[in-house]
């Protein structure tokens, strides 16, 4: 008789045993807690797979149980799945654990140092997990409790612990946009480092300086951010955790991008991507972090198509790890929305960009307060997309509705930015510039002019006369003067200035030049200068040929499969370039 193919595959003996334990969960609940952490986790994961989230939630909300589960390090990816499912289900497990840990710390305030040290270690692991999972407020509560324990003993071990606490605290405050608290956290860390120095001890400063760089970058203090990234790079040594090295390389790359030091930025971020994938694997959240920053680099060097692909890869990883309504997923959606908007700007096909922008806003509004700063950038991106959809819309009523929605989003973003950063800030200036463009679309030309001039003035004072951001605003004001206010002489000067900056920073094939060239062709047609019309038609044709050749083959992910240099060589190359150039600020 011929062999018949099995219609089911038998479970392994181990999986059968796990299933049997789960089937008898109510009776064996207490016994489960005495199992080794890996086996205990597998039981809980089976509960998750069977959709028994209430029972799983009751287990994970107990600090002792969850602390033990956290020790199953090779299951972290799966733990994120379970945890996010509970949060999506409405089980506030992050808040419950943070509160339980905080209470425990208050109970043991009078206990001996060994008890406190054990609690601090638990806090670091718990807070680290909550931070990695994006639950920053709860992680902050945990790290503050750890810091409080550290201050109870004025001795060297606890000074080291306090420094580590401050670094972690600064990271979660940066992630949660609590920038006003960030600087005091850094100063506290420096106080403990000074104490250690006086006793002949040194704590590595790479992670601390890297987090300070992230804080300053978020506040658009780019010169200061760059300076501290250089200091962080000096602190990279062979014994540092790979995670710290990767994060410092990422921050340094971003600082180089905004300083328009693209060669340095490329070397740093490509090595960070390679290092993260090599050490953590291609499905790890840390790898997705590096991809987002790689996408940022590619977008800024005008390799927009590859930027979209990289952002999509980062989103795919974050969705596979976290899924659901998670802040890490939201930020990836937002980055992909903006790059898709830029990529499809000429075609006018904004469905994909709008989808990702709305997903980002939907997630953020679900898990964070409605006045959270993270909403400012997501709303800004959606507003930009709606404006372009409105411009292409043939129904006047729909056009007005979309423009008004975009206006409300831009105003909301501007208020959030001003509240966080004040008037004199690059982020605030960007929002003024966006409003200027919108007012032009709404045919409110004087208001548009006022907004553009305000944006240019702030950007010039903060970034200098020849920055990319300045060129953008100058080009937008030129467009207003050319298309709607008939101020051709002013428009011509501004177009030529915008073109000069774009060529200097990005070369002859820069994508943004198209709009300036087309603007000049229209301008010279309007003024009857047909010789110039012919000249710029030729310039535009040459530009199109350059664009066809640019970035036609390169696969950005293939480009980082290996690294031609070691980490030490990358760091030394960067630092040597600083010595050659001298101080940057």
UniProtKB/Swiss-Prot annotation:
Gene3D superfamilies in the cross-refs: Tetratricopeptide repeat domain
Matching InterPro entries: APPBP2, TPR-like_helical_dom_sf, TPR_rpt
Keyword annotations of the record: Cytoplasm, Cytoskeleton, Membrane, Microtubule, Nucleus, Protein transport, Repeat, TPR repeat, Transport, Ubl conjugation pathway
Regulation of its function: E3 ubiquitin-protein ligase activity of the CRL2(APPBP2) complex is inhibited by APP.
TPR repeat locations: 50-83, 120-153, 206-239, 288-321, 333-367, 429-462, 471-505, 514-547
Designated name of the protein: Amyloid protein-binding protein 2
Subcellular location: Nucleus; Cytoplasm, Cytoskeleton; Membrane
Molecular-function GO term, any one: ubiquitin-like ligase-substrate adaptor activity
Source species: Rattus norvegicus (Rat)
Subcellular location, principal: nucleus
